[in-house]
Structures are given as C-alpha cells and as structure tokens.
Amino acid sequence: MAENVVNDILKWLETQLQRNEGIKIDTIANKSGYSKWHLQRIFKDFKGCTLGEYVRKRRLLEAAKSLQEKDMSILDIALMYGFSSQATFTRIFKKHFNTTPAKFRENGTMPDTHCFMSCETH
C-alpha cells in the first residue's frame, strides 16, 4: 500500500514539475489522504530521502536541462523552478553540482542523475 501511495505521489510530482506548478507538501498530503508527518515517514522509508529533498533535486535536474537550452536567462530559470532568487538558485545549484549555473551552462554536460538522485535507489 505504501508503495502505491509513493508511486502515485511521484506521478503527480512529475506532472507538476512539467507544468512548472508549485509543489507544497501540505497539498501532496491532502491528495494522499495522509497527514503531512505520516506521508513524510512513508516517503522516506520507501525512497530513502525526504519528500522535500526529492522535490528539490528534481527541480534542480529540470533547471539543469533548461540551462542547456540557453534560450532563457538564469534568473528566469531560477524563478520558473521555484527558487526565490538567482542568488538562492546559484547557491543551491553549486552545493549539489559543484559548479555555478553559468559555468554549467558553458560546459553543458548533464550530471550523472543516478548518483545525484541517490535517494531513488531505495
């Protein structure tokens, strides 16, 4: 049953990410029928990371794909994927990819997503 809940959440998250719509844990909890705290526990037990960590990593991966396109500014990409500013986006991006969005854009090589999304292996 928990696996079905998590799989349903993952499908919903992917749809929201593709639409660039906001993702709130309270909304996900309401959709699942579980309390926010219980949902967090189920998700972490099944995926090995918190729901917030998973969403942040997925947003970063989508932002990295957009950076490769080079037709949008870094600020527009940051805002599109839910980061409050370019500075916040740059700080979080650098923490996860060990490079800035601008340098990543110059290089254009996507990271190893399996390693980056390591919480998916559980």
From Swiss-Prot:
Any one GO MF annotation of this record: DNA-binding transcription factor activity
Alphabetically ordered keywords of this record: Antibiotic resistance, DNA-binding, Transcription, Transcription regulation
Listed PROSITE patterns: HTH_ARAC_FAMILY_1, HTH_ARAC_FAMILY_2
Domain HTH araC/xylS-type: 7-107
GO terms, biological process: response to antibiotic
Positions of the DNA-binding region: 26-47, 74-97
SUPFAM superfamilies in the cross-refs: Homeodomain-like (SSF46689)
Functional description taken from the UniProt entry: Upon expression in E.coli strain KY2563 confers resistance to antibiotics ofloxacin, ciprofloxacin, tetracycline, chloramphenicol, and ceftazidime (increases minimal inhibitory concentration by 8-32 times); also decreases expression of OmpF.
Name of this chain's protein: Probable transcription factor PqrA
The species this protein was found in: Proteus vulgaris
Gene assigned in the entry: pqrA
